[in-house]
Swiss-Prot record:
One of its GO terms (biological process) is microtubule-dependent intracellular transport of viral material towards nucleus. This is Minor capsid protein L2. It is found in: Virion; Host nucleus; Host early endosome; Host Golgi apparatus. Keywords: Capsid protein, Cytoplasmic inwards viral transport, Disulfide bond, DNA-binding, Host endosome, Host Golgi apparatus, Host nucleus, Host-virus interaction, Late protein, Microtubular inwards viral transport, Phosphoprotein, Viral penetration into host nucleus, Virion, Virus entry into host cell. Residues 1-25 are annotated as: Disordered. It comes from the Viruses. Disulfide bonds join 33-39. Belongs to the papillomaviridae L2 protein family. Pfam families: Late_protein_L2.
């Protein structure tokens, strides 16, 4: 009954939920039982390293060294240096040699501050020292003073001068563009120096062939012009497959991008080049005529039916396939700038007759008009009234300037009252009597023709116009 009661009590005793309770480690037991002295006999040697195996390794390592063999490493690689075949020496890595130290010489306060870059070289005395002879007395040496200096006259009066110059030429380098005079020539008694000269030499006559080129040779724009004329490329703006759209907005000329998309302040495009646009699935352009436009090509100026037309060719993207290809028609956008009016015929009337103009600088044939002018009486009285006349004088200041003839300018001269008392005697009278404030002699009375001169001032009667 007693054993049954004990077995029943053991069965009723509660068991830990995890099964058998684990024993603490040797390190944990050593920390708690060392001070109390209740440690099991296998805990202290294991923690303190005094087991039999530890003693064998401790005393055996004093006589045998197995450090590089990797015994007990468990890696199987042979340690740090690896396995070495038997009978061979392991490879050794040469150690870098240390650099020799630099000797630093201290500099004192009295030493110079300038350090010489050249090392001081020691003087080596070679040879046997000069022998010394004993002296047994001396002799009296008498000297005399000479006033004439001991100078030798090297130059001679009648000897010739010989000058020789030797030049060395490097055959590997010759610069033909530089003309150098030849070296002086060796002479006897005088110096002869040659000057630079250029000699002519014969050249080879090479026959030249002329290329057979058709067309006008005076207006060739290229070195080898292509015969024939190339037709200008057609723009293809008025084809049957191109839609014609007239644009009224003048912004189409300056900023066509504003008609396709709304203004983007960050966009800085060039309106003269091809413009590319990208739209979302649903969009509304500012101008309905530019719906689905993805490209506007560069502008072109044409003339059609008497007008100047500004044109751009556009590309629509109405449909988009699954592969991303866009399909659309070509559109010709144009804006008429202005009509070309026919040339108007305006009746023009001359302001002055051409027959009354006289050029004072015109060349006159003296042989033909000399006889007629010489027989003309020049001793004639003036009426005293200045008649209006025209004179064309070229005003040139370095370059010829085309002037338009204007209206005549008349100047009334004062009329002398009679009787007139001359201040100088009239007799003997001159062969030629000239009246007027200024005058020009007839070319027939000039002995030598002078070169035509340019005058920068315009001279009129009595007045000078700057």
């Amino acid at each position: 009954m007693k054993h049954a009661h004990l077995s029943r009590r053991k069965r009723a005793a509660p068991r830990p939920p995890g099964g058998r309770q684990k024993r603490a480690s040797a390190t944990q037991l050593y920390q708690t039982c060392k001070a109390a002295g209740t440690c099991p006999p296998d805990v202290i040697p294991k923690v303190e390293g005094t087991t039999v195996a530890d003693q064998i390794l401790k005393y055996g390592s004093m006589g045998v060294y197995f450090g590089g063999l990797g015994i007990g490493s468990g890696a199987g690689t042979g340690g740090r240096s690896g396995y070495v075949p038997l009978g061979s020496r392991p490879a050794s890595i040469p150690e870098p040699l240390p650099r020799p130290p630099v000797t630093i010489e201290p500099v004192g306060p009295s030493d110079p501050s300038i350090v010489s870059l050249l090392e001081e070289s020691r003087l080596i005395e070679a040879g046997v020292p000069a022998p010394t002879f004993p002296t047994h007395g001396g002799f009296e040496i008498s000297t005399s003073e000479v006033s004439t200096p001991a100078v030798l006259d090297v130059s001679s009066g009648g000897s010739d001068v010989h000058v020789s110059v030797t030049s060395f030429t490097n055959p590997t380098f010759t610069e033909p563009s530089v003309l150098r005079p030849p070296p002086p020539v060796e002479a006897s008694g005088r110096l002869v120096i040659s000057a630079s000269s250029v000699s002519t030499h014969s050249y080879e006559e090479i026959p030249m062939d002329t290329f057979v080129i058709t067309g006008d040779h005076n207006y060739n724009t290229t070195s080898t012009p292509i015969p024939g004329s190339r037709a200008p490329a057609r723009l293809g703006l008025y084809g049957r497959a191109t839609q014609q759209v007239r644009v009224v907005d003048p912004a189409f000329i300056t900023t066509p991008a504003r008609l396709v998309t709304y203004d983007n302040p960050a966009y800085e495009g060039v309106d003269d080049a091809t413009l590319q646009f990208s739209h979302s699935d649903i969009h509304q352009p500012p101008d309905p005529d530019f719906l689905d436009i993805v490209a506007l090509h560069r502008p072109a100026l044409t003339s059609r039916k008497g007008t100047v037309r500004f044109s751009r060719l556009g590309q629509r993207a109405t449909l988009t396939t699954r592969s991303g290809k866009r399909i659309g028609a070509k559109v010709h956008f144009y804006h008429d700038l202005s009509p070309i009016a026919p040339a108007e015929s305006i009746e023009l009337q001359p302001l002055s007759s051409q027959g009354e103009l006289y050029d004072i600088y015109a060349d006159v044939d003296g042989q033909e008009d000399a006889a007629a002018v010489a027989n003309t009486p020049l001793n004639s009285n003036s009426s005293g009234i200045a008649s209006p006349w025209n004179t064309t004088v070229p005003l040139s200041a370095g370059a010829d300037v085309t002037l338009q003839s204007g209206p005549d300018v008349s100047l009334d001269a004062p009329v002398a009252e009679s009787p007139v008392h001359p201040g100088v005697p009239l007799r003997p009278s001159a062969h030629i009597i000239l009246y007027g404030g200024d005058f020009y002699l007839h070319p027939s009375y000039l002995g030598i023709r002078r070169k035509r001169k340019r005058m920068h001032n315009f001279f009129s009667d009595v007045y000078v116009a700057a």
